[in-house]
Amino acid sequence: MRCPKCNYLKSSVVDSRQAEEGNTIRRRRECENCHTRFTTFERIEELPLLVVKKDGTREQFSRDKIFNGIIRSAQKRPVSSSAIEKVVNDIEQKIRSDYDSEVSSVVIGNLVMDELAELDEITYVRFASVYRSFKDVDEIEALLQQITNRVRSKKKRKADETN
């Protein structure tokens, strides 16, 4: 590994540990020439994954687009950035394990919706209003009714479990 200070090509690894939930290895290195210490990260090079959009066009998968969409939907909500990061990691892991080279934007949107439904209902509704492009208030009411029914059934299950 080339030293960032003197450009010498040989360095030794001083420390090595996992980072980012085991998806990355962080290495602390020392240049054999000038003894400068620096950090490198090693991760698996993912094969490019293409997203097939509704109009048939393809673009490279971007976890940042998912992250930014959720951030916008979660504005002024009690949802931590670490919770959002976990949701994005879970979605990306599901996509990469289930799809080799292409995935539909509809599949991604549905995965995001499923995760947000568990994370925060308001964030879910905000995301859904953009993702589903509601045409009128009736469609929003139907979504709210689905959420209400889901919350009621969760409360009923919890009550049944405690009795």
Swiss-Prot record:
Cofactor: Zn(2+)
Name of the gene encoding the protein in the UniProt record: nrdR
Zinc finger (unnamed): 3-34
Residues of the ATP-cone domain: 49-139
PROSITE patterns tied to this protein: ATP_CONE (PS51161)
Molecular-function GO terms, alphabetical: ATP binding; DNA binding; zinc ion binding
Domain of life: Bacteria
InterPro entries in the record: ATP-cone_dom, NrdR-like_N, RNR_NrdR-like
Its biological purpose: Negatively regulates transcription of bacterial ribonucleotide reductase nrd genes and operons by binding to NrdR-boxes.
Cofactor, free-text remark: Binds 1 zinc ion.
GO process terms (BP): negative regulation of DNA-templated transcription
Pfam families assigned: ATP-cone, Zn_ribbon_NrdR
Family: Belongs to the NrdR family.
Keywords for the protein's UniProt record, in alphabetical order: ATP-binding, DNA-binding, Metal-binding, Nucleotide-binding, Repressor, Transcription, Transcription regulation, Zinc, Zinc-finger
Protein name from the UniProt record: Transcriptional repressor NrdR
